[in-house]
């Protein structure tokens, strides 16, 4: 049966080394303490774990395959490439692993209203889905720019019974939607559960989201031993806030020996030198955003700079505290690829494997194109295919002018 692993970090104060913590208004501290206590209790409750396991299997469609991408492996001519097919989950992305867990926790705590922020709309759709499943009232905050880019997901959320509130402030993207969601939570904290979509925000969110997503890496461990009798040599995943990557990395990150190479791929947007990117680790500085100390993008005046990526799910101007810690401690390495490279990865996977990936996942494919050819043929690389690309096809068509 499913267990939620006990990792060595965060510490009792919710810190990963210097990162993480709880930088929030006093009014939210009791709510976060209540949430942490409820989560720690649920994590040890066999009935909660059994129910989560049931919904992950019967509703979401776990376990997902670890698929040998033979044509892609041949094309690159280096290591053998395996894809962790999170794109095959119900709702089309890894987000459902976390939203099911948090919705069950909300119900357990007696909260009948859930709120969420969303960028690409995948998390919003996922929250609207579990709210419908468990009969919860649902409000999703989404930046106006993302509402434009992801019209299909907006309609999906409404179809599932959620109220979508467009946010016109700031850059009108994920950061601004998150600000509004936090404001709502402060106002309605007694009745409302905030389902945060990534490994960001104040403690216990980075820990909780990681634990719910770690099913990805735990499955990869088991499947690797079954398929090729050992652990992979490298794991590659796209990093925005960082939940799909942490879900893959965490079960390997704390291994005393034999840890695969962990590679997180950030969005370089139009190039790191242009200022139009979302590479918080690659080009950011340490600071506090949305209740957590982590790597961020901000200017000389301390103002958060707008993140840019072709992928709506990666344009968050920060990266989770555990990734920030991994980067400093050398547990994982972080690279970045441009919009242009990601679009090439998007097309490549479609043509060689018959799989249209999400633009987020296409960043991981694009970086793999640089490292896999340099590896030996008997080595194994696992790429986390965090979501499917249906939601992105219209935007890609617009960007490429309909020309492939």
UniProtKB/Swiss-Prot annotation:
One GO cellular component term noted in the UniProt record for this chain: cytoplasm
Keyword Lyase recorded: yes
Catalytic class of the enzyme: lyase
EC number of the protein: 4.2.1.20
Cofactor section: pyridoxal 5'-phosphate
Domain of life (superkingdom): Bacteria
Keywords assigned by UniProt, alphabetized: Amino-acid biosynthesis, Aromatic amino acid biosynthesis, Lyase, Pyridoxal phosphate, Tryptophan biosynthesis
Family: Belongs to the TrpB family.
The protein's name in its UniProt record: Tryptophan synthase beta chain
Gene that encodes the chain: trpB
């Amino acid at each position: 049966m499913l267990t939620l692993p006990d990792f060595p970090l965060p510490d009792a104060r919710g810190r990963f080394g210097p990162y993480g913590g709880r930088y929030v208004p006093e009014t939210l501290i009791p709510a976060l303490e209540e949430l942490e206590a409820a989560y720690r209790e649920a994590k040890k409750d066999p009935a909660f774990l059994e129910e989560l396991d049931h919904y992950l299997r019967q509703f979401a469609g776990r376990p997902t395959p670890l698929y040998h991408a033979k044509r892609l492996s041949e094309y690159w001519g280096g290591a053998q490439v395996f894809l962790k097919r999170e794109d095959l989950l119900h709702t089309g992305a890894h987000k459902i692993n976390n939203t099911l867990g948090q919705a069950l926790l909300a119900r357990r705590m007696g909260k009948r209203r859930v709120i969420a922020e969303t960028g690409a709309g995948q998390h919003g759709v996922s929250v609207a889905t579990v709210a419908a499943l468990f009969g919860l009232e649902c409000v999703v905050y989404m930046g106006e720019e993302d509402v434009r880019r992801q019209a299909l997901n907006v309609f999906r959320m409404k179809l599932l019974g959620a109220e979508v509130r467009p946010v016109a402030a700031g850059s009108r993207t994920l950061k601004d939607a998150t600000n509004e969601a936090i404001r709502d939570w402060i106002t309605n904290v007694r009745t409302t559960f905030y389902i945060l979509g990534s490994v960001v925000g104040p403690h216990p969110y980075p820990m909780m989201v990681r634990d719910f997503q770690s099913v990805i890496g735990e499955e990869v461990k088991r499947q690797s031993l079954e398929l090729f009798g050992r652990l992979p040599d490298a794991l590659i995943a796209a990093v925005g806030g960082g939940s799909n990557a942490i879900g893959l990395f965490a079960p390997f990150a704390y291994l005393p020996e034999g840890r695969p190479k962990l590679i997180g791929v950030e969005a370089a947007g139009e190039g790191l030198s242009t200022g139009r990117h979302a590479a918080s680790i690659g080009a950011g500085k340490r600071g506090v955003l949305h209740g957590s100390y982590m790597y961020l993008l901000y200017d000389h005046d301390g103002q958060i700079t707008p993140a840019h990526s072709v992928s709506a799910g990666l344009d968050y101007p920060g990266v989770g505290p555990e990734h920030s810690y991994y980067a400093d401690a050398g547990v994982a390495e972080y690279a970045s690829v441009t919009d242009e490279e990601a679009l090439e990865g998007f097309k490549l996977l479609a043509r060689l494997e018959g799989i249209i990936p999400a633009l987020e996942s296409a960043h991981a494919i694009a970086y793999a194109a640089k490292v896999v050819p340099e590896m030996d043929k008997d080595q194994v690389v696992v790429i986390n295919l965090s979501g499917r690309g249906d939601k992105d096809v219209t935007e890609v068509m617009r960007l490429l002018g309909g020309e492939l």
